Amino acid sequence: MKDSERTKNWYSEVATTYATGYLALATSEQRKNWYSEVADAYNRARPRYPKELIDRAVEVAQLHKDATILEVGCGPGIATIPFARFGFSIVCLEPSQEACQLARQNCASYPSVEITNTTFEEWELEAEKFDAVLAATSFHWVAPEIGYLKAATALKDNGSLILLWNMTPQPPYEVYQALHEVYQTHAPSLARYEERGTQEEQLRRFGQTVIDSGRFKGLVSEQLACEVTYSIDDYLLLLSTLSPYIALDPQERNSLFEGLRAVLERNCTRSILTSYLSAFQIAQKI
């Protein structure tokens, strides 16, 4: 299979996972700026990674206090900050200029964090320099024929690839049922509910891809069931940062959100309790 076909198949699989076919068709430039218009919303609404999960990831990856980390797609620094608190030196790569600005603001108290506005694909490789390559809900955006080889090459001997994942927060099923008609009217492709088993299967597939790359071994996967409560405004803000919603026509998205808001205000109290899986997958360079 040609690299271009393999890349398209990879993005198609990711598109299936994230309920939008647009990712498979987007150009590299479009993927680079995918979150730019919602960078502030992403910073405000995306769930954080539990401290327990981060602490355990540091333990499994055996990161010492002087460890150097390369972070791929840091966004506004949601995962960067908890790792920076350990005192690690972190080089962060982020393709969105808007997200870079937020990351620099959020990480201003951590002088050991360096943020560069570039993609992992375009970054000039520094071989065998890093103790870990970190990607927090971002590695699926990297072209597969580049990502695993480049990550392995950047790592020192016995270095670790650390993939963090926050799956999409789901409302209670009865709330989903109340919203179903709105989705069927305005965005039928998004009218799905992710049960825990579905999210576990998505994580399993991502982990298997790491091993199938032939660049890493000894995959360790752990997960936590998490909850986060949103106001109606913040829940809609969260949805606005998810790829399936970003891919919608703006008018369709506005109509969808108006319908969702109306139902939520009619059926919910001021808050929505959501649940999701937060996980890490750590594998060692071969």
Name what the model sees in each region.
Residues 47-67:
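Conserved alpha-helix/loop element of class I SAM-dependent methyltransferases that forms part
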Residues 70, 76-123:
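Class I SAM-dependent methyltransferase SAM/SAH-binding core
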Residues 76, 200-286:
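Conserved Class I S-adenosyl-L-methionine
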Residues 146-157:
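A short glycine-rich, Lys/Arg-flanked "PGG" loop and its adjoining helix->strand segment in the class I
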Residues 1-38:
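N-terminal, positively charged/glycine-rich alpha-helical extensions of SAM-dependent methyltransferases
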Residues 131-145:
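A short SAM/SAH-binding and catalytic strip from SAM-dependent methyltransferases
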Residues 156-226:
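Conserved catalytic/acceptor-binding region of the Class I
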Residues 123-133:
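A short acidic, Gly/Pro-enriched loop at the edge of an enzyme's catalytic core
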